[in-house]
Amino acid sequence: MKSTAESKETPSQDESTTSVPCTEAPLVEEGEEASFGAYKRIFTFAGRTELILQAVAILAACASGAGIALQNLIFGQFVTVITDFTNGISTPADFRDNAAELALYFVYLGIARLVLSYTYNTLLTYAAYRIVRNIRHAYLKAALSQEVAYYDFGSGGSIAAQATSNGKLIQAGASDKIGLLFQGLAAFVTAFIIAFVVQWKLTLICICIPVATIGTTGVVAAVEAGHETRILQIHAQANSFAEGILAGVKAVHAFGMRDSLVRKFDEYLVEAHKVGKKISPLLGLLFSAEYTIIYLGYGLAFWQGIHMFGRGEIGTAGDIFTVLLSVVIASINLTLLAPYSIEFSRAASAAAQLFRLIDRESEINPYGKEGLEPERVLGDVELENVTFSYPTRPGITVLDNFSLKVPAGKVTALVGQSGSGKSTIVGLLERWYNPTSGAIRLDGNLISELNVGWLRRNVRLVQQEPVLFQGSVFDNIRYGLVGTPWENASREEQMERVQEAAKLAYAHEFISELTDGYDTLIGERGGLLSGGQKQRVAIARSVVSQPKVLLLDEATSALDPHAETIVQKALDKAAEGRTTIVIAHKLATIRKADNIVVMSKGHIVEQGTHESLIAKDGVYAGLVKIQNLAVNASAHDNVNEEGEGEDVALLEVTETAVTRYPTSIRGRMNSIKDRDDYENHKHMDMLAALAYLVRECPELKWAYLVVLLGCLGGCAMYPGQAILMSRVVEVFTLSGDAMLDKGDFYASMLIVLAAGCLICYLAVGYATNTIAQHLSHWFRRLILHDMLRQDIQFFDREENTTGALVSRIDSYPHAILELMGYNIALVVIAVLQVVTCGILAIAFSWKLGLVVVFGGIPPLVGAGMVRIRVDSRLDRQTSKKYGTSSSIASEAVNAIRTVSSLAIEETVLRRYTEELDHAVSSSVKPMAATMICFGLTQCIEYWFQALGFWYGCRLVSLGETSMYSFFVAFLSVFFAGQASAQLFQWSTSITKGINATNYIAWLHQLQPTVRETPENHDKGPGSGAPIAMDNVRFSYPLRPDAPILKGVNLKINKGQFIAFVGSSGCGKSTMIAMLERFYDPTTGSITIDASTLTDINPISYRNIVALVQQEPTLFQGTIRDNISLGVFNPNTQPFFSDKDAVKSVSDEQIESALRAANAWDFVSSLPQGIYTPAGSGGSQLSGGQRQRIAIARALIRDPKILLLDEATSALDTESEKIVQKALEGAARDGDRLTVAVAHRLSTIKDANVICVFFGGKIAEMGTHQELIVRGGLYRRMCEAQALD
């Protein structure tokens, strides 16, 4: 029969609510195209200082650009000097003196360019750092201010990854590229002004060049911006999906889900790749049109100039040469607009995506200052006729005309089935949501009229699945003091309060035993603590501020019986004088409540005290009977609050000596630890990185061939110009028809050059984007796949938080896209042009060529390579620093309910901003140093042009080279300098691409310890039993000095049901991790069917094992998808295959598994049934519903070994009873071996063997009856949970 209560869905209180769409199709919504309005808005985030810096920088860039154009005047005078010498007007000595004087102007220009280019690059880059910092700050502030429903809808994308990756795109488009743009525009304008002054008629003809070029660039950039925006949207949702996968990496390993999930991730990438392919013809058009238009205009100008000269409209050849050189300079700088326009387009698209969230007004804004803040809080809570449906499912009513009065200072308990609305009341009291109708009051005031921050600071919450933040234990508990008078107290005062709260939560003792006590770092989401330890720290965090209203949503669900009893007493004490609302499935924890409210279907079924409800013999009494344990307590067996008894004390004495490992073992542990450290990796240089990228995708050979041929054709542009312009000078020595005929011929040659540019750059633009999009797709998929291959200890490392990893998944492939797109073509063309121009110079005038090429090119290239090397180191450092800020953002947004309930939005934002400020400040000095190298790359060309001009004229005057040869050689050197200067304008993209390639290559070759190898490929686990543990000792790899298991000996036979019980942190869950082979023993061994576990193929072994975790992990997708992921299919294809084992699971199998987990009733009652989206992390389901889906996923696997780590901790009493029967049946199904960790002893009392852990060892072992008779630790645990 269907349970109607279950149809009233309660979205989870789980924290993994970041933002994947609730629906499965379409993959992304169509977004609005980013406009350059978004680009302009970027600069509204600049402060006064940044605006001043930008203004100074732009002036410097314009001056630098003017300097580029002023060389045309020098060239004009140079032609006059040449003409005078050729015509015999000046002597060789005068010729050399005049040449030396003109050469000095080049030296001065070089010095000016050095100062100006250094100035504008440094100032603009620093200003961009600050602007992007402000945008990221505003973005995270907006994210933290959104109401919880925003995340329920999956509206956010991966917020942390977007803040980092989109910030990098904005940085790229709002820093030095602006200076290069203004420099180019200034050079273009100045060159045309010079040309107008010299010969206005001829210059007017050349106006067609910029008009056509800018028009083409504008149209293409607008269309391309729309595609870029769409790609960013798809990648944002792909990143969010990846975030959910990485957050649940243990489940991925346990069930072998990697290939299926990566394939699902790839569906997003395929969609993005389709859009990316549409950019290829646009880039082909953009580059080919620019160069073609320029050379067509150039040919037209030369043809017209010759004819005007022949008609006497132009007086001297020098004027034509000055105009033509001005057109060349203007054209060269105009061609740079194309790649810059793409950078600006990407920056605009990235900014527009961030601005959408920044502009969104939250319905419940925690930053708001409005609302009442009463001076005194009594704690009277009243819900009056409250009706509520979650925004994601408006058709399902969770609370229906619900009314409840909670008197001040009293304890009110809420019990009932999962999905009955208990946790919904908590969400409404915390103002995560507003009721659909009805009123909620605190001390008579509508909570909607109270200040949100004030309300949450006075109504504290401990959640069912507590979330801690990266940092120390002290930091986490101190968060509870935010917004109180003790927030800014001294550390000593805060520590005193923190310790008092920890003692109240029965956490002080275990915290004191940690390596660094309260300063011990606990890892991402508190991952280095056990579930019970995390829960106690969360309780301490909530009570440290001494709130007037306390909400406990299954606050003791993860505690062992002894700790639960003590903590419950502490909570009972803490509840004195304050209003407490308790949600509990363990009825022992609420029997002393002043009022127990039994809920079902959003209504109150019955309420009263424990005694009155027992006497009524109704629903509550039935639940109590289910949980009672058969223990006859005696007076002397009462729970001892101070210790576990004498037997425990003896154990402690024996354990103190076992704390160190032999040197060889420690050496092995350190080597494994160092292996996962990227900083120890030897980095590839640029050529090796490029070679790796080419080798990685051999299917792109055709595209690389097209690019190479196109680059070879494109590199002929500058040498061709040098030869043609040298011939132009010869034309002016002729007269009459001969001059016009030669002029027409060379003008037609420029048209041929334009045609060649059209073909070459069309091919290059199309092929490079094809390569870039393919590599981006491939490496996004590969980097996630390779991350999921790694051992669990890889994810335990501080630098490998979920947020940091997702940021790398997004930013590194994009860096490769930038490198291997048009940038690599421009770099290759520039390199080939330097080489060909150098060869041409040496060929026509070997003395001049050798002196200038080997005197000027090496220092220029050297300065550029030094910049790339320094820039690469800086990029690695800043990426690491920004990774820290990304981790803060990721954990805050993933834990949005915890952040909001603690009202610590400002604190999180301050931490995030401090990390951003640290990243900016620490980058300034090395960035300023790299800019010196950049300045040198921009000025050295002028210095070797000066050398070439002076030495070349000297050779001409001495008759050692002809005038034509000198012109060819000198112009070749001039164009080589232009090419080399352009080459290093893209050094930032080069360094980022090289660093990204290095990380991806390192990760790809990094082999996990737990993997399939040729040696173990055919070694299976046999029958899966017996399992024997021989003196197993274990310390987590990152905490070698903190032993968890201290010599465990155990044998589990086929078909047995074994239970592990004991206090939190004693090693129970670690045993499960050992059996799942998340880690290997530090010393000792585990054997399966007489084979050592480390010698068995881990894939084959895990195929016979199923795991249900204490905090179940679900992934974005439907309920069906999540259960299907539990099925092992021996024919599963690798991730790059289109086949998927998940699709082969029948609906009948799904239904059978759901029925076994007591989940079929609630699933079948949903409108979409098994095709209902579970949401990111299962956020659309309640905790109990998620747990049952996880159990169904384990049961559908039909495992030989079933591992249950608090598998029923989130279930209500009735569901637990049914599911427990199913699990017991599953445990006795055939020869299945079952290992269960449990704090609810009623769930394991029928186990064949119960192992009581204490201090990393098995203290007691036996059946339930045997251990009760023995009267030790286990008996006292049972007494703590007895209800009668």
From Swiss-Prot:
Membrane topology recorded in Swiss-Prot or TrEMBL: Multi-pass membrane protein
Transmembrane helix in keyword set: yes
GO MF terms held by the record: ABC-type transporter activity; ATP binding; ATP hydrolysis activity; ATPase-coupled transmembrane transporter activity
Pfam families from the UniProt entry: ABC_membrane, ABC_tran
Chain positions recorded as ATP binding sites: 416-423, 1062-1069
Compartment annotation: Cell membrane
Domain ABC transmembrane type-1: 55-346, 705-992
Keywords: ATP-binding, Cell membrane, Glycoprotein, Membrane, Nucleotide-binding, Repeat, Transmembrane, Transmembrane helix, Transport
Region of interest: Disordered: 1-24
InterPro entries, per the entry: AAA+_ATPase, ABC1_TM_dom, ABC1_TM_sf, ABC_transporter-like_ATP-bd, ABC_transporter-like_CS, P-loop_NTPase, Type_1_exporter
Residues annotated as transmembrane: 55-75, 99-119, 178-198, 203-223, 282-302, 320-340, 705-725, 745-765, 824-844, 846-866, 931-951, 955-975
Every ABC transporter domain range: 381-626, 1027-1280
PANTHER family in alphabetical order: ATP-DEPENDENT PERMEASE MDL1, MITOCHONDRIAL, ATP-DEPENDENT TRANSLOCASE ABCB1-LIKE
Function, as annotated: Pleiotropic ABC efflux transporter involved in the protection of the cells against a wide range of toxic compounds.
Family membership noted in the UniProt record: Belongs to the ABC transporter superfamily. ABCB family. Multidrug resistance exporter (TC 3.A.1.201) subfamily.
Protein name: ABC multidrug transporter atrC
Organism, as annotated: Emericella nidulans (strain FGSC A4 / ATCC 38163 / CBS 112.46 / NRRL 194 / M139) (Aspergillus nidulans)
Gene that encodes the chain: atrC
